[in-house]
Every structure is written in C-alpha cells, then in structure tokens.
C-alpha cells in the first residue's frame, strides 16, 4: 500500500480585505471586496490592531463598494461593534453603495456609537472623504 504524500509547500490565499496606514495623513484606508464572511472581518481587525504602524487616533476610510456577497453574521457585527480598537471620537467613514452592505454598515455604526465611536456610512466616496477632511 503506498504511503500518503505530503507537501511542505504553502498555499497562499488572498483574503478579500486590505488596509494601508498613512502616518503622514493620519489615515487608515481599508478595502473589503468579494464574498465576505466573519473570518475575513475578524482577521482584518486582528491584523490591523496588531500592526506596529497602527495608531488608534488615526481616521479610517473603509471602502465596501466591492462586496458582492455578505456572509457576515449578526453576532459578528455585535461582537466587533463592542470590540473597538480605534479611540473614541476618531472619525471613521464607511462607503457602501449596495443597500444590503449599507444596512450592515449602519447596524455596526449604530452599535459602536454607544462606545463613543464616530462612524458615518456614505454612499458617495467623495462625501466620505470630505467628512474625514482628506
């Protein structure tokens, strides 16, 4: 009977989230696209909060216009809204053009506001940038 063959080669999987930290502009720009689930949101937040360049007082711009499928549970929205790592009062703008994505973002923003978060959801990216002052 042949023995199983195992490979030590790593397989890279591109998650549908990225972020960029711009210390000069004091801005975190996050982008979320494709089919998004609890796992991707959790991993994005954990990676961002532990990035040595991250500063919780930086503003955030979240581009959600490329999301095609929402697989994020209500419990994840509740959990992440209570687990804030941006400083209270820091402006965060979410851009969502799809109605379902917009609603999910608003649900998150409303829950997070109770912890002093300042989050606005926009359908227009230029208005979001104007509100952030960028």
Describe each PLM feature range:
Residues 2-134:
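Amphipathic, Lys/Arg-enriched alpha-helical "gate/interface" segment within cytosolic domains
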